[in-house]
Amino acid sequence: MELLIHRSSAIFLTLAVNALYLTSSQNITEEFYQSTCSAVSRGYFSALRTGWYTSVITIELSNIKETKCNGTDTKVKLIKQELDKYKNAVTELQLLMQNTPAANNRARREAPQYMNYTINTTKNLNVSISKKRKRRFLGFLLGVGSAIASGIAVSKVLHLEGEVNKIKNALLSTNKAVVSLSNGVSVLTSKVLDLKNYINNRLLPIVNQQSCRISNIETVIEFQQMNSRLLEITREFSVNAGVTTPLSTYMLTNSELLSLINDMPITNDQKKLMSSNVQIVRQQSYSIMSIIKEEVLAYVVQLPIYGVIDTPCWKLHTSPLCTTNIKEGSNICLTRTDRGWYCDNAGSVSFFPQADTCKVQSNRVFCDTMNSLTLPSEVSLCNTDIFNSKYDCKIMTSKTDISSSVITSLGAIVSCYGKTKCTASNKNRGIIKTFSNGCDYVSNKGVDTVSVGNTLYYVNKLEGKNLYVKGEPIINYYDPLVFPSDEFDASISQVNEKINQSLAFIRRSDELLHNVNTGKSTTNIMITTIIIVIIVVLLSLIAIGLLLYCKAKNTPVTLSKDQLSGINNIAFSK
């Protein structure tokens, strides 16, 4: 009867989830803005992690000493092999404990201090650990150091004398207890007794008292199943150097996870949200190796607390917007760089530029505020008016018109330039649309794939409403001669300022050139005038000379009487 109830509940839950998915996806709307080559997908709701909840899980172990399983029977060999695995796992955990983040005091946030602690402690390790594992450990810590700081702080306290016994005593008569640790932090602790009870009450009596005579294979299978959790936990901690994510079902079973969620100090809506999205919760959770002592394996489980839920969220998709009326190789391009997830949060907007860090389940967006930037609500104006005066919208510029496509929630943005062939296709009808040069958008209704050159994109098949907002591409407002290229982290105002600087420089150059030309013209006029004056003077002098010469030549010669006499005639004198 109980199984039937569980199956009925599971079927009901599945139907409810499917109904929720269909209903929520139909509420998604998408607006494409032709002027900026961008699209906004709306209709999502937030689940933002704002804190962490830490709990301590303890797995009680058995002290297995020498066993009497030395027979040749297959079942005996299997039991002995499984017992050896158990003891090896315990030994591996004991060695690993000396190299955990808590043991080596790596709970600080700063990356340089993480590195110093890691280098110093790995030098002094007496445990033989490969260099590959050390590098992986260091890199992992640098990546998640801030996220797991609270969990490591709890894990460190468990290394203090008496802390494990304090937890054991609190769990003597119950499987759960709130324990106040030495640092003043109270944590919920849970114990797992399945493995210890099976070994002590079922397995060891057979092994030691009956000389390991096993009558059926079921005993072997039962022990393997019981032992698998410890072996897998050991493997995960060993491979991941003591810190694992996501949270596996070996670290915390589904029933244990749901029970832990129910005990968290959060609202019923938050509990309902987490309980219905356990896979997302696991992806954003951590388990941290702490200590193995007093026949107890203790590790910390760190779960996300979603402090902001049910506020509107939207996703911005952007693609390059380039000119198309200029010869090939001379086009200019502009791309919005503010793509990502946005969620309303206490009067402002939480912006998640790395959209892949957010997980989407139907219309619910699970994001970590550690990966967010806080922006004013005016940032939304960039979608409808990129030149608005209240928020400086972010863009990048280039002079490389690369064709590409961006898959959105309800369609695809296609940036098609040059000689690239861009098409949209239906799996049954083939190509149904060929895109011309420029930025365009296609809905997923009747479209299965988008092809840009040799690249094929599959569109999402969510249902919703599409809106195509037409407008003049803003790139056409810019002059290619003064448009700044390769501005990878800029804004509209910065680009416009550089354009104004370029225009001012051009105007100044024109003025200088004009002044130079004016000076040259004046000089030329003066030189020409001087030359003309000189020529006129020379011509005047020549004219006067000629006039005097001609006048002198035309005057008759008159002789005196003495000159005409024979005596005084010079012609006869000698």
UniProtKB/Swiss-Prot annotation:
Pfam families: Fusion_gly
Keyword Lipid metabolism on entry: no
Residue stretches spanning the membrane: 525-550
InterPro entries named in the record: Fusion_F0_Paramyxovir
Site-annotated residues for Cleavage: R109, E110, R136, F137
Keyword annotations from UniProtKB, A to Z: Cleavage on pair of basic residues, Coiled coil, Disulfide bond, Fusion of virus membrane with host cell membrane, Fusion of virus membrane with host membrane, Glycoprotein, Host cell membrane, Host Golgi apparatus, Host membrane, Host-virus interaction, Lipoprotein, Membrane, Palmitate, Signal, Syncytium formation induced by viral infection, Transmembrane, Transmembrane helix, Viral attachment to host cell, Viral attachment to host entry receptor, Viral envelope protein, Viral penetration into host cytoplasm, Virion, Virus entry into host cell
Family: Belongs to the paramyxoviruses fusion glycoprotein family.
Protein name as catalogued: Fusion glycoprotein F0
Organism of derivation: Human respiratory syncytial virus B (strain 18537)
